[in-house]
């Protein structure tokens, strides 16, 4: 073998080794690489509402962790097949922690989680877990009960209005807690419900609000994602109670308060665990005590004695002395659902499929 051919073979061997080395580096994740995080939302972020509150959580983790993380968020993703495609795309593109912030993302996320065992998934408002998928929720019903005290105290017609998205337990328990809070101070109060079968549809939310006002409701609240209910009530000169965010900029005169959601600390905790490699799938359900649910400032029209009742109920809730579904709880037909001296269990809450007394109409099945 000539010196030339030997040198050529050596050069070829070194080139191959360098190429292989570069491929290994390119295909691995350095400890210095940022943790890629994805958020999937069912509605636009906007400046108030369900998705807006979750986006405050995104901003909180970006401020907290800086260049240790890289975040991508996708808005207005329909529940179902499209959600599965979006979640799968996020996982395929290297996002190692993915949050899905709508109930209807649950089954699509389960499918994707099984296909990406090395990725962490978190689903909001659902009930399923996997080896690499947890779920998280807030005890919205606690805030509903407190806001019901306000509504029951302020109504003149004794008819409250409620614009609701879908007849799932999360929404139903909110309606029931709201009227129980109202009746704790005003036994004559009743609530009428209009279902719009959408999380975010400002047009239908507005139409439902007007319909409820036409039926005699003088205070309107909602379990939907936009500000349309508060805005429509303001235009009609009727009181409202916002949901998700403080919506007083859309109801400066007539919003009495709002049930507010606070996700920031939850997202910070999950990201920290992912960075520390201590993340585990859990089912988290925080409420007023944990700071995940609150009320915005009360309208100046709310008397001090009403504000005091709300504050006392909140303090009792935090102390474990007050549960919105402490027995006896009777459904519309008079059937006892929770016995006197007992509190409803989380399991029964999570499958609530009945209206309590004080709710007008029949629950869609």
Predicted regions and their residues:
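Intrinsically disordered, low-complexity repeat segments enriched in small/polar residues
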Residues: 5-6, 14-15, 324
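Glycine-centered signal
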Residues: 7, 28-29
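Bacterial N-terminal signal peptides
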Residues: 11-26
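A residue-level marker of the well-folded mature domains of exported/periplasmic proteins
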Residues: 31-365
């Amino acid at each position: 073998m000539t010196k030339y051919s030997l040198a050529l073979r050596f050069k070829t061997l070194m080139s191959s080794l360098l190429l292989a080395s570069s491929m290994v580096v390119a295909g691995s994740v350095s400890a210095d690489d940022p943790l890629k995080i994805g958020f999937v939302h069912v509605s636009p972020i906007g400046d108030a509402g369900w998705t807006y509150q979750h986006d405050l959580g995104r901003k909180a983790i970006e401020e907290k962790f800086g260049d240790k993380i890289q975040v991508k968020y996708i808005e207005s993703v329909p529940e179902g097949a499209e959600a599965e495609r979006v979640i799968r795309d996020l996982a395929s593109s290297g996002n190692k922690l993915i949050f899905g912030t709508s109930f209807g993302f649950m089954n699509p996320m389960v499918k994707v989680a099984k296909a990406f065992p090395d990725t962490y998934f978190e689903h909001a408002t659902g009930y399923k877990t996997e080896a690499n998928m947890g779920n998280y929720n807030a005890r919205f019903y606690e805030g509903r009960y407190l806001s019901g005290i306000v509504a029951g105290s302020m109504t003149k017609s004794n008819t409250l209005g409620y614009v609701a998205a879908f007849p799932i337990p999360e929404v139903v328990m909110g309606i029931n807690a709201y009227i129980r809070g109202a009746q704790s101070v005003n036994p004559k109060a009743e609530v009428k419900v209009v279902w719009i079968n959408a999380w975010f549809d400002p047009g239908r939310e507005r139409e439902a609000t007007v319909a409820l006002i036409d039926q005699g409701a003088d205070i309107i609240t909602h379990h939907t994602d936009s500000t349309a209910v508060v805005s429509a009530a303001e235009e009609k000169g009727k009181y409202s109670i916002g949901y998700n965010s403080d919506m007083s900029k859309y109801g400066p005169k007539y919003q009495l308060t709002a049930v507010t959601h606070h996700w920031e600390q939850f997202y910070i905790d999950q990201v920290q665990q992912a960075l520390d490699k201590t993340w585990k799938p859990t089912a988290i359900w925080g409420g007023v005590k944990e700071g995940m649910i609150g009320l915005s400032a009360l309208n100046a029209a709310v008397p001090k004695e009403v504000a005091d009742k709300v504050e006392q109920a909140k303090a009792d809730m935090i102390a474990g002395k007050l549960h919105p579904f402490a027995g006896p709880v009777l459904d519309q037909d008079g059937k006892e659902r929770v016995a006197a001296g007992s509190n409803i269990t989380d399991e029964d809450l999570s499958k609530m499929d009945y209206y309590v007394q004080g709710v007008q109409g029949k629950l869609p099945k």
